[in-house]
Curated annotation (Swiss-Prot):
The lineage of its organism: Eukaryota, Metazoa, Ecdysozoa, Nematoda, Chromadorea. Keywords: Cytoplasm, Endosome. It is found in: Cytoplasm; Endosome. Belongs to the BLOC1S6 family. Homodimer (isoform 1). Component of the biogenesis of lysosome-related organelles complex-1 (BLOC-1) composed at least of blos-1, blos-2, blos-4, dsbn-1, glo-2, mutd-1 and snpn-1. Isoform 1 interacts with blos-1 and blos-4. Component of the biogenesis of lysosome-related organelles complex-1 (BLOC-1) involved in gut granule biogenesis. This is Biogenesis of lysosome-related organelles complex 1 subunit 6. One of its GO terms (biological process) is positive regulation of gut granule assembly. One of its GO terms (cellular component) is endosome. Residues 78-106 are annotated as: Disordered. GO terms for molecular function: protein homodimerization activity. Residues 82-93 have a biased composition (Polar residues). Residues 94-106 have a biased composition (Low complexity).
Length: 106
C-alpha cells in the first residue's frame, strides 16, 4: 500500500468517523429533547393528579348534599300534596282532614 493510498484510506475513515460523531450528537440532542418533553409532561400529569385528589372530598360532599336536597324535595312534594288534599276536603265541606307531619330538620 502506497503512502497516497494510505492517506486516502485514512481520510475516508476520518470522514466516516466525523459522520458517525455528527449522527451521535444529533441523536443525543433528540433524546435530550424527548427527555425534556417527558419530564414536562410528567410534571403536568403529577399536577393534574394532585389537583384531582384535592377535588375528591369536595365532590363527595356535593354528592351527599345533592342526595339530601333530593330527599328534602321529595318530602316537601309529599307535604304539598297532603296540604292540597286537605284544602280540597275543606272546600268540599268534608269534615275529614288528612294529618300532616312536620319534619323539624326542614
Amino acid at each position: 500500500m502506497s503512502n497516497t493510498e494510505h492517506n486516502v484510506e485514512s481520510k475516508n475513515v476520518t470522514d466516516t468517523l466525523d459522520e458517525i460523531l455528527r449522527l451521535q450528537e444529533d441523536i443525543q440532542a433528540r433524546i435530550g429533547s424527548s427527555n425534556h418533553n417527558l419530564e414536562t409532561n410528567f410534571e403536568s400529569i403529577k399536577d393534574f393528579v394532585s389537583r384531582a385528589h384535592a377535588y375528591i372530598p369536595i365532590l363527595n360532599q356535593i354528592s351527599k348534599d345533592m342526595i339530601e336536597i333530593c330527599e328534602r324535595t321529595q318530602a316537601l312534594k309529599k307535604k304539598t300534596s297532603q296540604l292540597e288534599l286537605s284544602d280540597t276536603n275543606i272546600e268540599d265541606g268534608s269534615t275529614t282532614s288528612t294529618p300532616t307531619t312536620t319534619n323539624k330538620s326542614q
